[in-house]
Amino acid sequence: MKKLIVFALSLTFLFLTCCGEIPVTETTTQEETTEPEIETTTEAWEIDRTGEEIYQAHPDLTPVDYTSPMILPLSEDMGQEYVDKLTFICDSPTYWMWPWGLLGGGEDTNSIWTGPEGTMTLAYQSSYCILDPFDNIEKPIRQVVEEHKPEYLILAVGINGVSFMDEEEFKADYEDLVSDILEISPETKLMCQSIYPITPAYRWWGDITNVMITEANSWILDVAEEYGVPYLDTFSVLLAEDGHAKRELMGSDGLHPNYEGLKTVLQYIRTHKYREVTKAVG
């Protein structure tokens, strides 16, 4: 009897379905999809601690804060092609890259921006005119930046302010220059470079010492952290174990790196390539 009832119900259901009384729900089989694997790579950044042992041996020097995320780490050698893209706003220790033909264009380079006498002073940066190498006309720094908007710009100034500027004055002028460059040319990849060490052969040794320079370099790093600008520790690459500049890399005046010294600086820069860094919070 039960089988007959089930059979009758089945016939009824079939009849109603064929007549359209009961809707038929169409089912589809969803194909299983898998998300494509995204290859992620984490680049290991190795901080170059070149001068660490020297700072430990000379506690009077202000050591580099190697924990700072602004310090550019070791990278692959970017080669002369990278160097040829660099522009420097600089004072006299870096100026000599120009006459020695170390940058793009050789002795005809347009990559050294400084005063007509081959130097400039940080304290006067707001009003000082540098020589625009593209037309040999003296112009305010900011005007030259606005007109040419370089791809890479390295700020290599400060030695001419170390002897008479305190921390507040030094930072104020350095910040003013950095913030204006970032505003005028936001696509420019700006880097801050440390002041080079000197030797006691410098005739004004005492008015300027490496103790003072390392302190000023810590101020530069502070500004770099505030504005999220990468920092090049070019001081340490020229530093000898005695806490002064390596004499074989310096000119006889004790202030300016010689040809090999500036080649050493550029080798450091091209093996510590620009990368974006995270601005300090607070």
Q: Where in this protein do the model-derived segments appear?
A:
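N-terminal secretory targeting modules
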Residues: 2-89, 93-99, 276-282
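Conserved SGNH/GDSL esterase-like catalytic core that processes O-acyl groups on lipids
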Residues: 76-172
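A structural signal for isolated positions on well-ordered beta-strands in alpha/beta enzyme cores
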Residues: 87, 154, 189-191, 230
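Sec-exported extracytoplasmic/periplasmic mature domains
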Residues: 98, 146-149, 158, 175, ...
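Active-site segments of SGNH/GDSL-like serine hydrolases
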Residues: 156, 160, 182-214
